[in-house]
Amino acid sequence: MSKNERRTFLLDFEKPLWELEARIEQIRHLAEENNVDVSEQIAQLESRAQNLRQEIFSSLTPSQRLQLARHPRRPSTLDYIQSIADEWFELHGDRGGYDDPALVGGVARLGGRPVVILGHQKGRDTKDNVARNFGMPAPGGYRKAIRLMEHANQFSMPILTFIDTPGAWAGVDAEKLGQGEAIAFNLRQMFSFDVPIICTVIGEGGSGGALGIGVGDKLMMLEHAVYTVATPEACAAILWKDAKKSSQAAVALKITAKDLKELGIIDTIIPEPSGAAHVNPLEAAAILKETLVNNLEELSNLTPEERKTLRYEKFRQIGVFLESDSNLALHS
């Protein structure tokens, strides 16, 4: 991401760091123009910037992580595919007359291994987001996804899914076309597949829209991704009749990778580059690729029956809670 883009999409909590980095660049430029050696001062300022970056990103609130997950320049499914896949051939259509641009997928080669990759796809600007329906798939998108996954299962190719959606499309037409049935069918079928399945939340994992491609042997999240039953804004509006309490809802919902790892819902937190994935997309992709390759190798050592049994047990263990604790979280 260029400096101008970063400044355009600067988040409030990033401003102190941006101002310090801009000051460093200004001093460096003036020193070069006047042939003055300020290397010692620059080193001190860069050390301060590094410490400030560490301080900011080690103490992010759930709401701030949500801002990072929704960042307009955060790498998307297609961005990651283009960076990690040795070969990639996109497949289209649900064979029912619909090709949903909000959910993309195809055949790829990862680390020398043929795989099927699919995921939600948001847009880069307003026009692109409208075309992609802001990453909210219609029923045809989930039917396209299951078609590709059945293809993968038939030809013994592992399945990799990238989750990045505020939720499935909730329009009247989506309900008429069977949104609930399409997602439910995917859930059932994904439990039955023989091949390894790895699901990764790369940005925003929202509600049933995320679950529709979220059943796997491994569920992973990027460090600053979020995964939630409902957006904090929607949760606040429902519980407190006030969307402005979204920050409070974000805490209660336990949406961060750290929270979900502690709750046993996800298996792995994938670290992001300093400053988050949008600052250095290539490094983020390299870390993601290494993690996927290693986990695929591990899962390939299991038999299909072992994988399906562990997959079933993994999801059966999700959802145990104490009512008193949940009430405390809602009223705190």
Swiss-Prot record:
Cellular compartment(s): Cytoplasm
Substrates-to-products reaction catalysed: N(6)-carboxybiotinyl-L-lysyl-[protein] + acetyl-CoA = N(6)-biotinyl-L-lysyl-[protein] + malonyl-CoA
Name of the molecule in the record: Acetyl-coenzyme A carboxylase carboxyl transferase subunit alpha
Gene3D superfamilies for the chain: 2-enoyl-CoA Hydratase, Chain A, domain 1
Keywords: ATP-binding, Cytoplasm, Fatty acid biosynthesis, Fatty acid metabolism, Lipid biosynthesis, Lipid metabolism, Nucleotide-binding, Transferase
Pathway: Lipid metabolism; malonyl-CoA biosynthesis; malonyl-CoA from acetyl-CoA: step 1/1
NCBIfam families on file: accA (TIGR00513), AccA_sub (NF041504), PRK05724.1 (NF004344)
One of the GO BP terms on file: fatty acid biosynthetic process
Keyword RNA-binding listed: no
InterPro entries: Acetyl_CoA_COase_a_su (IPR001095), ClpP/crotonase-like_dom_sf (IPR029045), COA_CT_C (IPR011763)
Task of the protein: Component of the acetyl coenzyme A carboxylase (ACC) complex. First, biotin carboxylase catalyzes the carboxylation of biotin on its carrier protein (BCCP) and then the CO(2) group is transferred by the carboxyltransferase to acetyl-CoA to form malonyl-CoA.
The keyword Ribonucleoprotein is annotated on this UniProt entry: no
